[in-house]
UniProtKB/Swiss-Prot annotation:
Pfam family, one: NdhN
Subcellular location: Cellular thylakoid membrane
Keywords of this entry: Membrane, NAD, NADP, Plastoquinone, Quinone, Thylakoid, Translocase, Transport
Name under which the protein is recorded: NAD(P)H-quinone oxidoreductase subunit N
Provenance organism: Cyanothece sp. (strain PCC 7425 / ATCC 29141)
Subunit structure: NDH-1 can be composed of about 15 different subunits; different subcomplexes with different compositions have been identified which probably have different functions.
Lineage: Bacteria, Bacillati, Cyanobacteriota, Cyanophyceae, Gomontiellales
Record keyword Thylakoid present: yes
GO molecular function: oxidoreductase activity, acting on NAD(P)H, quinone or similar compound as acceptor; quinone binding
UniProt record similarity statement: Belongs to the complex I NdhN subunit family.
Length: 158
């Protein structure tokens, strides 16, 4: 990969397909350059870790409940000794509502995507069709050079 890159082809492919699977060198640094190019092109980026998200459709686009570990503690003054459920807003919708006025969209940059199942990759490949302002970039593994491929092709091949 060239030391200086404009990232134009990467941004064009991301806008065309909506979701890209990328392979990055293990020494790092390349993904930061492309994130900087995306921000310079007018996109807002959100960097999250793919493992542990749970049910992707509910986590990204619906209000969902989260229960913290109780660690043997009880809720004082409450007759039900269960653990409270906290309801969180949908991640994608919340960030879309709070985008700057001139932003072109939101890019979800997910690391460690190699742990996602084929169904989860298929869902992430169709999410940009449901939410046109959302683009997805998933790091699927390592390689000697920074390369990308549309996620639909990768989900079909996996």
């Amino acid at each position: 990969m060239a030391l200086f890159t404009t990232g134009r082809q990467f941004i064009q492919d991301l806008e065309k397909s909506g979701a890209l699977g990328i392979y990055v060198p293990s020494e790092g640094g390349f993904e930061g350059r492309y994130q900087r190019r995306l921000r310079a092109a007018g996109y807002s980026t959100l960097h999250i870790s793919a493992p542990g998200l749970g049910d992707l459709p509910s986590y990204l686009t619906q209000v969902h409940g989260v229960r913290p570990p109780h660690l043997g503690k009880s809720t004082q003054g409450n007759t039900d000794w269960g653990v409270k459920t906290f309801f969180l807003p949908p991640l994608v919708n919340y960030h879309l509502e709070n985008l700057p006025p001139k932003a072109r969209g939101l890019v979800l940059w997910m690391i460690d995507g190699k742990r996602l199942s084929r169904q989860e990759l298929a869902y992430l490949s169709i999410l940009p069709a449901q939410e046109p302002k959302v683009k997805i970039v998933i790091e699927l593994g390592g390689d000697r050079q920074f390369r990308w491929q549309p996620l639909k092709e990768m989900a079909a091949a996996a």
